[in-house]
Amino acid sequence: MAVQTLKDLLDAGVEGRTVLVRSDLNVPLDGGEITDPGRIVASAPTLRALAEGGAKVIVTAHLGRPDGQPDPKFSLAPVAAKLAEILGRNVQLAGDVVGQDALARSEGLTDGDVLMLENIRFDPRETSKDEAERVKLAKALVELVGDDGAFVSDGFGVVHRKQASVFDVAKLLPHYAGYLVGAEVEVLAKLTQDAARPYAVVLGGSKVSDKLAVIEALAPKVDTLVIGGGMFYTFLAAQGVSVGNSLCEESMIETCKGLLDRYADVIHIPQDVVVADSFSADAESKIVPFDKIPDGWMGLDIGPESVKRFAAILTGAKTVFWNGPMGVFEFPKFEAGTRGVAEAIVEATEKGAFSVVGGGDSAAAVRQLGIPDEGFSHISTGGGASLEYLEGKELPGIAVLEG
């Protein structure tokens, strides 16, 4: 990665300098409580290194989709509190993004202080398609930092977005890749350029349309592509099988037919499914062969025979990439498929395989199921960004660091 890194910045000395850090702190909340602090934990090393080096650290991040205006339920207050706990030092929270409070607090910072700006997406310019609007916000962020400031990009989950705090601000300040962004790119480069064989990919999630580009990109390059989750039922429909009330993207059926024809030796789909009579945690359920889904029932997980088959593939692999759960893991009755796949990947890792969990719902599933992060070589913090990287797309937030 031909970019300046956080190590370069620290080696040059940060004492007394103000450093703006774009972190990815977009964690799940339930009633204001953080249910999975994984992204905050992953962001802490960069922030800790800067603060301990004597920098005045200003953190910018988003939470949820607040529609370009302040919304109390998307305040970063619980995130700032959790970050303070993890860092073991005070984290101030500004009452605005680049307004009077943010400016006053930034001017009052002393060496080693950490200031978090309020949710950057409270400002509509952050995600504007109008470059001039984004640049105005980027300049306001630079004003908080001052003339000898620096920018550290450490929010891997947003580097595929051309947004003010990710892309435009990097053009206005000396810019560096944080520890997290550097590690993520290194891992993904290994998956694309240096993967040990056999190479197995597991894709789940609800929609084929969300994963089509990555299927097209990876199918010619891997040994096995395992398909599960809600999108599997569109592949079933492509084989002329009735899927009952299961999720199915009618518009993608022909595309799935083409994929199954072209990559018959590579694509593996479940042979049995766990079906339910309704979408609920306490629905009546049963295990049926893939071609015997009853009318009015829906598939909510892969079945035990499929778990066995997939586990045999995965435990024999030397490289594994997993993105997307196998079923509705949030309901205990339908978590077994996702758990079985996760445990098989852990076993492969114990045997020496290089395993990557591709962020998003997969990372949430791993943690909800109580499987230690250490069971995998790497858990990505960026679902969409990791997929776009594997698709071969340019990531604006990385490209600008290379410029």
From Swiss-Prot:
Q: State one molecular function term (GO).
A: ATP binding
Is Lyase a UniProt keyword of this protein?
no
Positions of substrate binding: 24-26, 39, 62-65, 121, 161
Under the heading PROSITE patterns, the entry gives:
PGLYCERATE_KINASE
Q: Can you list the GO cellular component terms from the UniProt entry?
A: cytosol
Q: Which InterPro entries match?
A: Phosphoglycerate_kinase, Phosphoglycerate_kinase_CS, Phosphoglycerate_kinase_N, Phosphoglycerate_kinase_sf
Location relative to the cell: Cytoplasm
Supply the alphabetized keyword list: ATP-binding, Cytoplasm, Glycolysis, Kinase, Nucleotide-binding, Transferase
The answer to whether keyword Lipid biosynthesis applies is no
Query: What is this protein identified as?
Result: Phosphoglycerate kinase
Positions with a binding annotation for ATP:
211, 299, 330, 359-362
From which organism does this entry originate?
Answer: Rhodococcus erythropolis (strain PR4 / NBRC 100887)
| Top class in the EC scheme | transferase
Similarity field: Belongs to the phosphoglycerate kinase family.
Q: Name one GO biological process term.
A: glycolytic process
Q: What is its main location?
A: cytoplasm
The reaction(s) catalysed by this protein are: (2R)-3-phosphoglycerate + ATP = (2R)-3-phospho-glyceroyl phosphate + ADP
Q: How does it assemble?
A: Monomer.
What pathway is it annotated to?
Carbohydrate degradation; glycolysis; pyruvate from D-glyceraldehyde 3-phosphate: step 2/5
Annotated EC? 2.7.2.3
